[in-house]
């Protein structure tokens, strides 16, 4: 068989009427060309079919690539006969964490065998088609072998213990083996962590030139485990320039419909929808799904008619499901996605669109003119920097500028560290503000989302340094309207520089929607016409270039007394003349008054709702009160006054214990608890401050207003406070016994322990002793641990369909040998109904539900 890495088939004999009547289109067409004018049909589930062929509970599916290759070839051919264009290799769980070097199985051999099985299936299928006269040979059928990459099973730092670069390496190992074996494209699927999918995409882009598709595992609310939503993920993946994006697994086609619609609304890239066959349940020890092939195809036709032409299946779907899907959808019109021309940046959890409604960029994380901030950088006082970010978020910023440029520090290292730490406690998008290309790349590589990049200008050497970074990592880049000749004195001169920036960016395939132009705000004290020139530039960018604009507003008043008066007036004028994003101090009462007033007067604030929300109650609401839905705060105080002065004191800064925990600030929580212990009783502090603060964050997590990074950082802050209290109680002879013991384990055959580890952190913070048995745990080991310590609660986790039988067997053995145990279960493949059928006492859809169940059984 010829090497297929660059020679891909082009003609479908069954995909569309056009293909059936026009004949061969040429053998040089690849998947990207094919999908422009044709439906693309993926295959369906693999694990459930392997189980039918004898894959045992806890057995590793990827080993069948070598042990039973004919089984894999037959499954692939069944999907091809059903009409699939893309067959995915049996490599979903293949990585060096699961198959370490020196182990029983060689990772490269498993991956190569998987690709070769797919290629063999394609070749044999082509022979069948040629025998019946449907094609001339293998090069006449549009069949592509996709190298399948699933999650590593680990949370990336700072949420977990897997380093980002290590994740990239793990994926590169698999990709290199798959590419050498002849894969046609890379399919990254079932991703629940935006940072992990970024690692996988970068690994693919840095290892090969194959097309890259990426699909995410959203819940019914359109959220990822780590907090991402549809808009933030689209921003990230389109910034990374994937060739198609979408969703798979976890949900059936009915539940996916609304998420698919949202994808269509915001994506300029082809959308993929690969649902499960409905929701799972257990029958006779086997996993079955509640939607049959006919119903599945009917629902998928509805999705196809929305404008989606890349369709397939995931868990529970079979060749019959795919055949019915192809029959109903192959002759539908193929719709290309419209280019949305949206200027959008994102964090891990939210997207900010720059357009009609002005955006506030907080300017306080910057050492310029701030002696305390400079000292914090020298002292490596990250908590001080985090406090600056938290305060700006509380006071209304939509984006935070991050500048750590100081000659005496290592700016690239500090920038990377500050970006990571800020994103662990704040969910706002960030603006990476640096003149150093090294610092810029370090920041862009570790950034979780699509960043605002500050900046590029019209100088050729600067554009050549910055644009390749934006093209590789994604981002919206600030274009300063200056060049080798300096800052033009006229608006016309600045517009000419802006045009040069836009034209040069196009060479790097960076569209005008990913450029935001800075008309340059000069101090009015030295140039009385400077403000008017800037305002004219704003209007011309808006009206002539149809572009987006940004300004560092406070530059206008440099050298003048009562600067806020000038700043606020100019800010309002600039907003009127088309300013889309303003770099200001959101802690400034005058600036925020100007902002909310302008929006209310410009029909940007429906019924003045935001204005009333801010100024109707002059005391406002703290973050904790907002999360809990109560007025008043939790005892904290504003860190900055109305003038936007620097934080007084160190990291603690007078913040209450509750506020420190809620905001995820460890040092602040430690300082607050030390102060509280001077006058309060340890148990009173725990029960009246620490636990209620955790409850506030937990309720926010359940409501979807707090996301996993914030939840875990709050847990870490609470843990640091608990350690101070424990040390105090140990010294005074008041040591407290844990509330009870809980066993946690990821079941045999499953290496994905993300959910288990999150549950562990929360249970420990609520005072329970956790016995963590790890991952890939045999049922006998769970039973042994439960009997040994007479543990009352056992928590079991499984991500993969193929490992749910292991969970059921573990529960069966617990019922036999440790009947007193209450079992809670969780994982992406489970539902309440499924948990009931395998004998669990409680299905826990998230970590907080596990805490609640432990409280019911053990008290507390």
Over which residues does each language-model region extend?
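Domain-level signal for soluble alpha/beta catalytic cores
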Residues: 3, 9-518, 522-860
